[in-house]
């Protein structure tokens, strides 16, 4: 799994590529999100465009960090889920719980 992090004003964009499945891929994602939140990020957009597969452990990581940020007064939002990843998010109804966007500019603007 490859993860790149960049800042757009007060928003942290986490761009993820690879598989968010049980094991090393999801461990990497969970660790990077925890590190980002512990570093003070309160507004996070996770770009899922490069995720090729997600399972229950990947879903758990997204939900756990969404809840963690919410408790701290922040927010986690999702960006560009595609294909099977979008299907999983729709079936689990996660897209109705966590704000999800197909356009980066709209995701960023949603924090204002």
Label each PLM-derived region with a short phrase.
Residues 12, 20, 105:
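Residue-level detector of flexible, active-site-proximal loop/helix-junction positions
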């Amino acid at each position: 799994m490859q993860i790149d992090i960049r800042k757009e004003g007060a928003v942290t964009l986490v761009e993820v590529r690879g598989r968010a499945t049980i094991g090393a891929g999801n461990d990497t994602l969970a660790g990077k999100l925890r590190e980002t939140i512990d570093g003070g990020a309160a507004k996070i957009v996770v770009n899922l465009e490069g995720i090729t597969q997600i399972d229950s452990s990947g879903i758990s990581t997204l939900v756990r960090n969404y809840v963690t940020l919410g408790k701290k007064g922040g927010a986690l939002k999702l960006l560009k889920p595609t294909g099977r990843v979008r299907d999983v998010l729709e079936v689990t109804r996660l897209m109705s719980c966590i704000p999800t966007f197909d356009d980066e500019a709209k995701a960023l603007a949603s924090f204002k």
